[in-house]
């Protein structure tokens, strides 16, 4: 069953989306209306609650364990096609479903999954928060004043990032951060995962607090001035590489 809803984008200032196992995709497109497209079984589509109140588009799905219709195989796709000039705040979460975001611009973004992969390709906002527990966090082409990305056991990969302040956190997952511009402050925290930073900087104030991990720099001088990189870990090591250095070229 398919369900298609259309909204005037000037009347929608934000999204509030809470899904259980459904897949969520949000993308900008050459459209005039804000389009909500849902595909799945009739029962599951009927279970979806959709409303617009006080300028906020809300989409919610019953949690898997609370649904009155539990099946062994279930599939539902929720897609938002958004006009390219739309700006607003976005709060979206899934439990096990994949979440994909393409080309969105807005104010504040909060995107969360439990075990589903969170994949972002093109995002611009004032504040961006990305969080997953065991899912992969795969981010490319993101610009924000402040950013916070957190995983527990999943790996965190960031490429082509532009931030003023950024915080990256993982317990056992590996953290890879590729930044396109110099930044003000970068805070990295892991327990056992390795940490790697690549940025177009020649010097930085780098601090690593670790029991067993080690600090390695390639083309970056560790000084008392410049962007601040603060890392904390039990056993994870930190590598900081200047973009364009031989080590950075070898890594790509």
Task: Locate each region found by the language model.
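Repetitive beta-strand solenoid architecture
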Residues: 11, 20, 53, 74-76, ...
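Active-site alpha-helical segments that house and flank conserved acidic catalytic motifs
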Residues: 15-17, 92, 111, 130, ...
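Exposed beta-strand and adjacent loop surfaces of beta-rich binding modules
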Residues: 14, 33-35, 47, 89, ...
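Short, surface-exposed interaction patches in beta-rich subdomains
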Residues: 5-6, 139-252
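Short linear S-[DN]-x-LW-Φ motif typified by the pepsin-like aspartic protease active-site region
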Residues: 1-60, 73, 77, 81-83, ...
């Amino acid at each position: 069953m398919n369900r298609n809803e259309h909204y005037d984008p000037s009347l929608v200032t934000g999204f509030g989306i809470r899904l259980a196992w459904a897949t969520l995709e949000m993308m900008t497109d050459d459209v005039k209306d804000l389009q909500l497209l849902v595909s799945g079984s009739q029962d599951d589509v009927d279970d979806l609650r959709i409303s617009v109140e006080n300028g906020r588009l809300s989409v919610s799905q019953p949690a898997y364990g609370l649904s009155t219709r539990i099946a062994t195989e279930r599939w539902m796709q929720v897609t938002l096609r958004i006009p390219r000039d739309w700006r607003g705040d976005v709060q979206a979460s899934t439990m096990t479903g994949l979440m994909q975001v393409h080309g969105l611009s807005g104010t504040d973004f909060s995107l969360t999954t439990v075990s589903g992969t969170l994949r972002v390709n093109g995002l611009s906002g004032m504040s961006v928060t990305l969080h997953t527990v065991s899912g992969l966090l795969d981010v490319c082409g993101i610009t924000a004043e402040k950013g916070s990305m957190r995983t527990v056991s999943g790996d965190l990969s960031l490429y082509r990032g532009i931030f003023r302040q950024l915080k990256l956190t993982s317990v056992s997952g590996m953290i890879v951060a590729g930044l396109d511009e110099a930044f003000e402050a970068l805070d990295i925290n892991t327990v056992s995962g390795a940490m790697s930073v690549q940025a177009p900087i020649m010097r930085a104030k780098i601090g690593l607090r670790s029991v067993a991990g080690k600090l390695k720099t390639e083309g970056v001088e560790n000084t008392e001035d410049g962007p601040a990189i603060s890392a904390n870990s039990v056993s994870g090591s930190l590598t900081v590489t200047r973009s364009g250095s031989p080590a950075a070229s070898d890594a790509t």
